[in-house]
């Protein structure tokens, strides 16, 4: 309705309307992210942060990233469960249980459940005892790299 009203006014008067200035004290700026650089999962984060991070990089994006057995993989959706019996922090990322459809991943605050349909590439077949892991080098690079884009969508990296 707002767009219709604006278009009606524009076509009647030829004027774009009154500009509304942003108040600096109410403004925030967050730089754009690039999935190839910024989507690495930090397994030391709180379990709820890992869940929201993975789900934020889900479709239409190309998934949150981590490694298993030296292979980069992408996770599209994950669900966290906090429980009274917690795992030791050294167990974080370990696959402690599997079913036909789900992979159960240990975390110090509980566990995460990954549907096998949300793990790519499909050629990766995690086994019990395997660990999802992201190297500190990849995590540091994701924090230290700023991405900017040109108007035509090309990436400009800043470090």
Regions flagged by a language model, labelled:
Residues 1-81, 151-159:
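Active-site-proximal loop/hinge segments within enzyme catalytic domains
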Residues 51-159:
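C-terminal active-site/capping subdomain that shapes the small-molecule cofactor and substrate pocket
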